[in-house]
Amino acid sequence: MTIDEMMSAIKGMTVIELSELVKALEKEFGVSAAVAVAAPAAGGAAAAAAVEEKTEFNVILKDVGANKINVIKAVRELTSLGLKEAKDMVEAAPKAVKENVSKEEADAAKKALEAAGATVEIK
């Protein structure tokens, strides 16, 4: 049977017969007739990323405030940095204290830093 003869035979089939043919081919050859999803174009990827819910956040120390020592202590607790490293980070504000963390962890860090007197932003 040639390809043209097969095409003619397929054209003469009903929708139910075509469905049965597809199922038989899938079973016989161990394949799936699922439609492959093409990757979106570069412009579409940016739009899709904007629609997706953000899952990673950065905690940014914007301003130390009046109580610098308490903010340094809070930074040390959150980051496990040494005293000098935490002090340098606080003095370099605005600075990311935690990066790529979950929403819950970012909120907890923000509360701890604000309780110490700092101004914090989550991005």
Swiss-Prot record:
The keyword Ribonucleoprotein applies. Keywords: Ribonucleoprotein, Ribosomal protein. Belongs to the bacterial ribosomal protein bL12 family. The keyword Nucleotidyltransferase does not apply. GO terms for molecular function: mRNA binding; structural constituent of ribosome. GO terms for biological process: translation. It comes from the Bacteria. The gene is rplL. Forms part of the ribosomal stalk which helps the ribosome interact with GTP-bound translation factors. Is thus essential for accurate translation. This is Large ribosomal subunit protein bL12. Gene3D superfamilies: 3.30.1390.10, Single helix bin (1.20.5.710). GO terms for cellular component: cytosolic large ribosomal subunit. The lineage of its organism: Bacteria, Bacillati, Chloroflexota, Dehalococcoidia, Dehalococcoidales. Homodimer. Part of the ribosomal stalk of the 50S ribosomal subunit. Forms a multimeric L10(L12)X complex, where L10 forms an elongated spine to which 2 to 4 L12 dimers bind in a sequential fashion. Binds GTP-bound translation factors. Pfam families: Ribosomal_L12 (PF00542), Ribosomal_L12_N (PF16320).
